[in-house]
Amino acid sequence: MRTPLFQAEHSGRYKRQALIGEYQQITGANLIVVIDQITPTNMTVLEELLFDCDPQKDLHLLLSSPGGDGETALRMVRSMQLRCKELTVVVPDMAKSAATILCLGAHHILMGPGGDLGPIDPQMIFPGEDGRRTAASAKEIVAAIGEAEERIRANPGSFPLFASLLADVNMLMVEQAKAALSRSEALMREALSVQGRTREEVDALAAKLKEPLIDAPSSHSAVISVDHATGYGLPAESADVNSEEWRLIWELWM
């Protein structure tokens, strides 16, 4: 029995549970929700959510994430594919970088009007000045160091300035960033192969995706819309924003 105070304190959770139940009844699919940065600790929570999923049913994932650890994203999509018939990733807002890797392993990507994927740009997570975790783009770390080296060569007197500007970056972080960047294409290919594509299909898709997802983008925030995604050959489609399913997804995300 729930006391009035307990009910009030946990009302948000009970409402989300009701929304998830209603969505599952309409679609006939299991639904899990991930609204978070992707880090290794996500795996334990995900396994808890997938624990009793029927592998003969479809699985829908509501995903909103700025990115994170690509290796964890690959582990997550592999685990989900083992627990379902077909995997649909629903993107109401953004699924960047590592979250895009996760989407590449799905059978379907359902995107809202403002939904977008992003470049596969590894994020380096390190302690900030306040002790909290902060993230920086691996590509931007390497680029910043490269530009600093060029400017110092041209003007050795600028060394103290750049040493101060890059005081939070050490050599280990730079090497980790370079290693993460070199792994990006392999992660993309592994994610594409998760849902059962043939080697030929993976090769063809990877060739189309390498330029827009890895090589070309200069910013982690670059937007890849549903039209771009379908143009690259991904199984993306626009959500029906007037449907009852989308109303439930929007309430869960908000």
Question: How would you describe each model-predicted region?
Answer:
Residues 1-254:
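Terminal-region recognition feature
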